[in-house]
Amino acid sequence: VKSVGANLRTGGPATANNEWIPDFVNYCEKNSVPLDFISTHHYPSDDPNWNADMHLDNFFGEEVNLNSDEIDRRGLLTKMVRIAKHEAGNLPLYYTEWNTSANEGDEFHDTPYSSALVTKTLIDNYGYVEAYSFWTFSDIFEEHGQVPGEFRGGFGLQTIHGIPKPVYRAFELMHQLGEER
């Protein structure tokens, strides 16, 4: 790539879960592979300490003790970013795909809790990440076939008919802040 254009930036490989970053960086260094940035994806379920039998509803249900660490899923994403940034070293870090859940059909996507988690995650990670790309803009999503209906737990900021979800409004408010922090 660099032989075609010396100014082209190379990085990646943009896979889920941050744990591959040290091996990737080490491989590139050992083999003189140009590496200008790290791109990755993350979801709360990427955490290696995540209990696979647990659903996000457990963290936001009425039974949860609001003073417990379990309610702080935003802290998990922030912890993951801090670790990834450390492992990336001086390389810029890009999250080219992220959301509050990796599961299509997770009702959590459509709730105000999701917008609070997104807002706090963005605020907590300001200055650590070069860019965040939220997955995805609309519930029109082809990977598993289109599921009909509004507010059915799709990944998007909007429903299939363009109705903004609470997380859309969170991004809208963040945009209105401009550069003010």
Per-region residue spans from a language model:
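Aromatic- and carboxylate-lined catalytic core of secreted/periplasmic carbohydrate-active enzymes
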Residues: I123-R181
